[in-house]
Amino acid sequence: MIFQSFLLGNLVSLCMKIINSVVVVGLYYGFLTTFSIGPSYLFLLRARVMEEGTEKKVSATTGFITGQLMMFISIYYAPLHLALGRPHTITVLALPYLLFHFFWNNHKHFFDYGSTTRNLMRNLSIQCVFLNNLIFQLFNYFILPSSMLARLVNIYIFRCNNKMLFVTSSFVGWLIGHILFMKWLGLVLVWIRQNHSIRSNKYIRSNKYLVSELRIFMARIFSILLFITCVYYLGRIPSPILTKKLKETSKTEEGVESEEEGDVEIETTSEMKGTKQEQEGSTEEDPSSSLFSEEKEDSNKIDETEEIRVNGKEKTKDEFHFHFTETGYNNIPFYDYEDSYLNMNGNQENWKLKDKKAAKRKELFRFEKTLVTTLFDYNRWNHPFRYIKNDRFEKALRKEMSQYFFQIYESNGKQRISFTYLPSLATFGEMIKRKISLYTLEKSSSNEFDKRWVYTNKQKIKNLNNEFRNRIQALDKEFLFLDILEARTRLCNDDTKNEYFPKMYDPFLKGAYRGRIKTILSPSKTAIDNLRDTIGINRIHSILLPDINIDYQEFEQKANLFDKKQLLTEMGNFLPLAGEFDIEQKSNLNMKGLSLFSDQDQEKIDFEKERKIFKFLLNVIRTYPIDQKIQKESVGIKEIIKKVPRWSYKLITDLEQQSGEHQENVPVDHQIRSRKAKRVVIFTDNKENTDPNKDNDTSDQRNEVALIRYSQQSDFRRRIIKGSMRAQRRKIVIWELFQANVHSPLFLDRIKKSPRFSFDISVLIKLLFRNWTGKGAKFEILEYTDEETKKEDKKEKDKKEENKRKEQARIEIAEAWDTIPFAQVIRGSMLISQSFFRKYIRLPVLIIGKNIVRMILFQFPEWSEDLEGWNREMHIKCTYNGVQLSETEFPKNWLTDGIQIKILFPFCLKPWHRSKRRPSHRDLMKKKKQKDDFCFLTVWGMETELPFGSPRKQSSFFEPAVKELETKIIKFKRAYFLALKVLKRKTKLLLRVSKETKKWIIESFLFLKRLIKELSKLNPIILFRFREVYESNETKNEKDSIISNQIIHESFSKINSPNWTNSSLTEKKKKDMSHRTSTIRNQIERIIKEKKKITPTPRIYISPNKRNWNTKRLELPKNIWQILKKRNARLFSKFNSFIKIFVERIYIDIFLFIINITRLNTQLFIESIKKIMDKSINKANKERINKKNQNTIYFISTIKKSIDTINNKTNSYIFCDLSYLSQAYVFYKLSQTKVSNLYKLRSFFHYLGTSFFLKTEIKHSFEKQGIIQNELSLKKLPSYGMDQWKGWLKGHYQYDLPSIRWSKLISEKWRNRVNQHHMAQNQNFKLNSYEKGHYKKQKDSEVYSLLNQKENFQKNSRYDLLSYKYINYQKMRDPSIYESPFQVQVNKNQDFYYNSNTYKHNLFDMLESIPINPYLVKGNIRYMEKNTDRKYFDWKIIKFFLRKRVDIESWVKINTKSNQNTKIGTNNYQIIDKIDKKGPFYLLLPQNPKINSPSPKKLFLDWMGMNEEILNRPISSLEFWFFPEFVLLYNLYKMKPWVIPSKVLLFNLNLNENVISNNKNVDGKQKTECVIPSNKQIKNKNQNQKEKETPADQEDLRSDAQKQGNLGSVPPTKTKQEKDNEEDYAVSKIKAGKKKKQYKSKTEAELDFFLKRYLVFQLRWGDALNQRMINNVKIYCLLLRLINPRKITISSIQRREMSLDIMLIQKNLSLTELIKRGVLVIEPDRLSVKNDGQFIMYQILGISVVHKNKHQTNQGYREQTYVDKNRFDLLVPENILSTRCRRELRILICFTSKNRNSVDKNSVFCTKNNSSQLLDKRKDLDKDKKELIKLKFFLWPNYRLEDLACMNRYWFDTNNGSRFSMLRIYMYPRLKSH
C-alpha cells in the first residue's frame, strides 16, 4: 500500500523480496564466514605453501571442507550439535590432540613409512593432514572461538523459517568464498615463485643457503605459529585451570547452618529436548540452562537464589517457583527427598537413618565431582563483567540468565511448545516423571481434560458475557452510570475491625504488587492447631503419594475423607521440596501456618476452593524457622517474590581489603581489580597496652597512618573481576601512556592530533621579506614597552611549559618503573647500592685523594672540614612518592612498592675551604637562592631535584681553581693594558712633532696658493667651485641612520616567531652584523653624497645657517622617501600576520566550497526526488483534498526546507515522507476510514431543508467529519487534516511527550522555531489579556493537587477514550469538544481554546491541550521516588521541577533586551498548562518590540545554542553529515537536561550569609533547625536585601555557559511570581519529603546532604597550595620519626620547606565557603534514564504525531462543558467490569478465539443506546463496515498499544524480566471473514 505512492514501487518491492530471501541471505552469511580466519586456516596454508605434493593439498582441502560441513550440519542436527557443543569434552579431547600434534611435527620421521605409491591412503601423514584440517574446524568453534562472523549463521537461523534451505545456501556461500580464497592464494604463491625480480633480489641471492633452510624448517615455523595462535585464543578464554579461583562466601541462614558452596556445586550439562543454550566465548556454562537430562547427572543445588529489586520494585511472576532452598534436609540429595516423600513414613528414626546414608553418599559424591568443579566453575566470571554491588548484604545478580526455555505445555487442550517455560518447573516435572509410575498419569485421558477445560472456559465466558449484557441493558434503562460499574473488591486484613490492605499493595485494586512487604504475624495457638487439624487434599497429592489410590472421577463427585496426621507429614515433606517453606525439622514435624479452615476435623472441600487454597499455600505462606529459646511461636508471611539467580561470591576491591571495610563473611583476598594504587605507610604509632588482662599478642597496638598512592597511568582494568575475559573487550586501543578515555580505532580521525611536521609559515615569510625593507630607511620604535612585556610574558610562558613538560616526563618515567615487572626490585636494590657506594666508597676515596694531592703541592690538608661535610650528608629513605621516613627505616614492601633516597645536605668536594670570615650580603643572597639543600639519588648515582627528574649539574671539583685562574688572568690583563697606555702616551708626543712639521708644509703650500691667486687676477680662470655644505647636518643624518638601522634590527628580532630559539651567542652575532651593515651603509651614503656635490654658481653666499632653494628641492624627495620607508617598515612588520590570515581565509573558503558542493548536490537530489514524489502524490490525492480547508502539515521526517516554504500559505498536503512509517501510519489511515454507522438515518441526514429533529450544528459537524456527505461535496472524500489524528490520540496521555523526550527523539531543531505567523494588532491588549488568562488558569487548576489520588482512573479514562474513538470512530462528533469524563468533571472552569477558523500549522503540531502528566516521566528516571529533591533539569534561568509540569511553546527564545516584568511577546510566548496554583517555573521572557522584522536580533538564549542565521532551515539528521559546522555547534552547546546542576543540589546555599552565620553560632546541644528550611522564613528576614542585590551565592553557582558569557546578563531583581516560585519550591520540598531528620550539627547535615545524592565531587586545591601541603606532609613524616626534631624543624622552616600558614587547620569551613573558594568542585551526577517499552512505543507513534500548541485569544472562544452522569458516549463498555473480570474475559476470549465470530461476540463494543436491540436484530450491517470493524479489532484487540509495540520490536526480549512479552503475540484473536 505504501509502495504504491512510489513510481518504482513494484520494482523496489521485488528487489526487497529477492534480497530478503533465505537463499540470498544464506549465501551472504556463508560468504561472510569466509573472512573469519582462525587457526584452522594455518593447516590449509601450510599444505599450499610447503610443496609436499598434490595428495596432501587435496587431503587438506577435503578435511577443511568436511569440517566446515559438519559444523553447518551440527546447527541443524541436534545430536551432532550436542556432541560438539559440550565444552568439557571438546577441551579434554583438544588439549591432548594439540600435544600430540606438536610432538608429531617435531619428530616427523617417527611416523613416515616412506612414500608407498601403491596405496596413498595407508600413508599416515596424509591421513593426519586430513584429520588436522577436519578437527581444527571443529575446535575453532568452541575451544578456539573465531570472530563473530562465524556465529551470525546461528543467530539468523532462529529467524529463518526454511532452516535447511538456509543452512545449505550458507554452506554454498562459504564454499564459493573458500574456492575464491584458495584460487587467490594459489595465484599469489605462483607469482612469488615465478617473479624474476624477487628471485633476482641480491639479498635472496646472497642468502641462498638461508632460503633453503627456511624451506626445510617451514613445518616447524607453522607449528610455532599454530602454538602462538592457540595460546592467544586460549588467552581470550581463560583456561579453567589457570584462571583465578574466587573464594566463595559461606552462606548463613537463620537457624540453619548450610554447607560451603564448594561442596554443593555440581556441573550439569545443558541438553534438554534438543535445545542448547550457548554462551559465546566461554567454555563454562550458564547454570540457567542447566537441566536434568540424564539420571546420573543429579544436582544438590541448582543455584543460590535470592530476591532482587529492580528499580525498587519486585519482578514477580504468577508461576510456581520450585527452587530448592537448603533447609534442615540439605544433607540429603534429591533421590533421598523423593524416597522420603514417597515412602510417607513420618518416623524420626527413619530420618536419622537416612541422614547417615546421605553422609556416606555425600563423601563418595564429593570425590566424584571434585574434578569437574576444579576444572570448570560455572559460577566464575569469564566475561569482563564489572561487579555491581546492589546491597551490603546481597550478592550480585547473574545477568546472563536466559529467559528462553523450551518445553512442551498444554494450551487449549493441545500440546504446544513454550519458549518461556519455567526451568524449575520443568526440572520438577522431570523428577516426578522419573520417580512416579505412569499409571497416575494415564488415569484420565487427555480428551477428558480438554473437554473439561473447554467446558469450564465456555461456562466462564457465558457468565461474564451475561453479566456484561445485563450491565449494558441497565444502561439502556438509563440507570446512573456510576451505579452500573462493577464494584471493586478489596483485600481485608481483619473483618471485625474493617482493616483493609493499603491500596498500593492491594492485588485486587492494583494488580499483582511488584514490591515487597515483610510482615511477621504472631497468630494464636488455636490458629496453628486449626491448620494442623484441617488441610485440604487435591490431585497433586494423588500424584505425589502413590500409597493413596484416589480415583479422580470419584474425587470430583464426593469429597474425600483423609487422615490429618498423614497429610501433615506428607505436606511437611512436600513443601520444602517445592522450595517455598523453610521448616525447621530436627526433632519432630510441626506444620506452622495460618488458619484457613473452620474447626471441624473432617470437611468436604470443593475442588475449586481447595485448588485455590493449595495455590495460596504454595505462593504466599512462607514459614520461618523457630528459635528454640523463644516461647512465642511466630509465623512470617512473605509476599509473592521472584527468585533470581545470583553469583555465589561476594567480592571486594583492593581498597576495601586494605582499609578493612569489608564484612566478616567476605573473603580476605580481593577479587575486583581497583585502580592501580599502593598503600604507603607514613607513620606507625606503637602504643603499649597497659591492660594486663588482655593477651600478650595484642599488647602492641600498631596504628598505621597511610596514604594511598594512585598510579596516573590510564588503567582500564578497573572494576573488572580477576580471571575475567579481558580480551573480549574488542576494538579498544590504548596508544598513549596517559589516556583519559578508551577510544576505538574507528574514531581515530576525530581525535585532535598535533601534526608531526608542522612548521610556522610566518618564520619563512620573515626570512624572505626581511631583506626587502630597503637601505637607509629610518624606523621608529612603536610601543617599545609593550614589546618588552610581551617578551617577558613569553619567557614566563615558555618556562611554565618547560616545567610542565619536565613534570610529564617525570610522571612517565615513574609510571614506566611501576609497570615493568620486577623493575622496582631492580631499582630499589640499585638505589641502595648507589647510596652505599656514594657514602662509604666514592666520597671517602675522593676526600683522601684530594688531601694527598694538597700535601704533594705543599698545601695544608683539610681533613677535618671535609669529614665534617661528609658526616653532615644524610641519606634518608623515602616512599616512592618522596615521603621521608628516616635513615635506618625502610618503607613497608619497598622492594615491590618502590623506594626513593633523599640526600640532605649533599656533600660537594672543594679543592680548598675558605677561612670562616663574616658572610657578605652577596653570599647571603646566594644562600637564599640555594635554599633547597637536598636532592634525590638516581639509579646511576647522580643527583636530581625531584624524584625521576633530570639529573642536575654537579659543581665541578676544579671550578674554584678555574675561577682563581680567571681572576689572575684578568689581573695580568689589567697590568698589560697599563703598559699599553704608557706606550700610547709616548707615541702621541711623536705624533705632535710630526704635526708641527706638517703645519709648516701646509703654510708653505698656502703661501704658494696665494701667489697663484695673485697671478689669476691677471687671467681670471675659475679653478675651483665651492658649494655650501652643512657638515653638522650631515653628521647628524649619519648618526640618525645608524640608530635607525639598529632599531630596524631590534624590531625585527621582536617580531620573530615563538619557535625561534634565541641564545645569547646568536644575539651577539646578530648585533655585530647589524653594526657592520649600518656602518657600511653610512659609508656608501657618504660616498653618494660626495658624488652628488655640484659646483656652486658664481653668485652664492656661503652662510653656515641658511639653506638655499636648490638644497631644499633636493631634500624634499628625500623626506618623502623616508616617510615611505617608515610606512613600508610598518607594513612589513605586519606582513606575516596578514599572510597568515590570508592563508587561513583561503583554507576556509576551499573547505566551505567543498562542503557546499556536497550539500547543494544532496539538497538538489533530495528536493528533486521530493518534487517527483509530490507530483505523483498530489495527482493521487487531488480528489481527496478539500480546497476550503487547506492546512500545511509538515512531518518530522520532512527534509530541510526554508522558512519561506514552511510559512507558505498555498502549500498542499504532503504525505510523501510518511512512506517510511510503521504501524502508526496504518492506524492513522484506518482511523480515518469512515463507514456510516447511521445506516437507517441516511435519508434523514441527506434532507436538505431545515430539520425539526436535528440541530444544524450537529449536522455541520457530521458533514465536516465525513459521517454524512453534503451534496456539494459528494464527489470529494473528506479532508485528511491533522485534527482526526489528534482527536484520536488526544485522550491517550502517553503520547504527549515532554519536550525533552522529543528533543532526544528528533534530530531537527524544531524547538528553536518561533511561531511567527500569528501576530496581534494591539500588542498591549494581547499581553494584558494573556496575563489575566494565565493567572486565572493558574487559580482554576488547584484541582490538580488531587492528581495522585485519581491518577489511575485518569489513565484508564484516557485509554478508554482513545480506544473508543478508534474503534467507533464513525459515531464520534467533533473531537476537540469532548474530553475524558474525569477531566471535564473536575475542571469545570477550564478554558477551551477551540479554533473556529482553519489555521496554518507551523512546522510541528503536537497534541492539543494534553498536559504532560507527572507519571509520564516518573518511572523513567532512577531514584525518582526516593529523592524528591532531585530535579529533572534546571537550567539556571529556567526553573523546572518534575513535580510540576509545563508545556513550553516550541522552545522559547529570549532576547537580550530583558525587562524586569515578565512580558510575553508574540514572537516568544509560553503556554502554561493547568497545573498548580503557582507557576511551575519562572522564565524571564523579554518583550520583542520588532514583531514584523524578518531577521530578529541576536538572541542570547537559544536552547540548542544555535543562532537564527544557522536556523533558517530545520536540520534533519541526514544533513549533519553535510554540515560539519552544525555538528560542532550542536555538540558544543548541547543543553544537558539530564544532568543535575550544582545549584539545585545545593539549593540551601541560596540562604544569605547572615543565616549561615546564625547557624554557626547555634550550640551543638541545642535543638537545631533542619538544614533546608523553608525559603519563606529566609525571605522574610532578608527581603530588602534580596530586592537590592543578587545573592552572591547565586552568582557563584552560575552555569559554565553563563560564566563564559554565552547567556548574557541576568536581571538582578526578581518578579513576585518568581519569588513565589522559590518559596513554593522550598516548601514543597519539605512537604514532599517524609519526616525530616533532625541533625545534631551543621556539618553532619551537610555531610548527609551530600551522601543522599550520588554526587561525584572532589576537593580542588590550587596547584601551589597542593604542593605546599604535600611538602608539609613529607616533613611532618620525617619529624615524627626523629628523637630530637628541633634542629630539622628550624632548618626546614628557614629553607621554607615547611609553610606555617598551612599548619593552622581551618576547622569551621562550611560547605558553602568551600564551594565559594572553588576548593570543592561538584560534578553533577548523570541520571540514568531507563528507556523502557513505552519509550519505543513513543518512537513508533512519534513519527507522525507532530504538533504545536496554539494560544489564539483573538480567534478563540471559550466554552464550558459539563458531563452528565448517565452519559455513555465516551465510555469503553468493557470498563463496566472490574479490572480482574476484564482481564479474565479477554483471556478467555483468546482461548476460544478460533470458534468465535468476532463481530457477533464483540458487537457489544460497537453499541449505541439501543445496544441490546442491535445485538439481536441488526444482522444486515454493511459488509465494508464488518470488515473494517474486524480489522480494527485485530489492530486494537482491547489491549494496550504496548502489545503492538511488542509485535513490532520485541521478538527477542531477554532482559526486561517479563516472560510474557512474547506470549502477547499469540493473544490476538484469529479472524475469519464470512
Swiss-Prot record:
Annotated region (Disordered), positions in chain? 248-310, 1567-1624
* Membrane spanning stretches: 18-38, 64-84, 87-107, 124-144, 172-192, 221-241
Q: Where is the composition biased (Basic and acidic residues)?
A: 298-310, 1584-1601
Look up the domain of life of the source. Eukaryota
Q: Name one GO biological process term.
A: protein transport
Alphabetical keyword list: Chloroplast, Membrane, Plastid, Plastid inner membrane, Protein transport, Transmembrane, Transmembrane helix, Transport
Topology relative to the lipid bilayer, per the entry, is: Multi-pass membrane protein
Q: Which Gene Ontology cellular component annotation is one that this UniProt entry carries?
A: chloroplast inner membrane
Where are the compositionally biased (Acidic residues) regions? 255-268
Question: Could you tell me where this protein is found in the cell?
Answer: Plastid, Chloroplast inner membrane
The job of this chain, per UniProt, is described as: Involved in protein precursor import into chloroplasts. May be part of an intermediate translocation complex acting as a protein-conducting channel at the inner envelope.
Q: Which family does it belong to?
A: Belongs to the TIC214 family.
| Binding partners and assembly | Part of the Tic complex.
> What is this protein's record name?
Protein TIC 214
Organism ancestry = Eukaryota, Viridiplantae, Streptophyta, Embryophyta, Tracheophyta
